[in-house]
Amino acid sequence: MAKFDVYDLSKKKVGELDLADAVFAGEVNEHLFYEVVKAKLASDRSGTHAVKNRSLVSGGGKKPWKQKHTGRARQGSTRASQWVGGGKAMGPKPRDYSYDVPKKVRKAALRSALALRSKDQKLVIVQEWKPGAPKTAAAAKVLSALGAKKALVVDDAANLALAKSVRNLHGSDFLAVEGLNVYDILRHDALVLTADTAKKLEASLS
């Protein structure tokens, strides 16, 4: 088990938390980051690119001139791809770029990302963070005290006050623990977890 310091919102140590080495202090595998982030970015692509082929371009139903005895090259339609205003030959069509990464790979990548933040001393665990009302200035002050600027804050989805407080901060974001992913961990410089959230991650990733 790895020991982690637990802080209050002013970064005063209030206790320690034992967490599984396999989840928070394992080996960092950067190739897993590549695989999972590539899949995530691929799934984010809209895939709506399209051009009109000759069947979609309006007009061109009539043969422009007779087949023979004109001295010109034979043509069947003014909307063929070699004509100005014609359809595009073999152009892009809408497609779905997403593909699945095995669940074991996704879990291993997430464990590796948590271990990376722990190794870099960019993982901060707080006892709890439950503001009474959304206050962006207060959230900024807390993150500054924790030394966690451009941070990803993770807690229960029900903590709406915290989510609204953090989302207006430039470079920082809030994620529900169920939605934690490798891409967002790597995209932020620091990771802030509550003690309960850390325990939930340990249980789900062990």
UniProtKB/Swiss-Prot annotation:
Q: Which Pfam families match?
A: Ribosomal_L4 (PF00573)
Biased composition range(s): Basic residues: 63-72
Cellular component, GO annotation: ribonucleoprotein complex; ribosome
Classification via InterPro entries? Ribosomal_uL4, Ribosomal_uL4-like, Ribosomal_uL4_dom_sf
Q: Cite the residue spans of the region called Disordered.
A: 48-97
> Sorted alphabetically, which NCBIfam families does this protein's record hold?
rplD_bact
Instruction: Give the record's family classification.
Output: Belongs to the universal ribosomal protein uL4 family.
Q: What does this protein do?
A: One of the primary rRNA binding proteins, this protein initially binds near the 5'-end of the 23S rRNA. It is important during the early stages of 50S assembly. It makes multiple contacts with different domains of the 23S rRNA in the assembled 50S subunit and ribosome. Forms part of the polypeptide exit tunnel.
Q: What is this protein called?
A: Large ribosomal subunit protein uL4
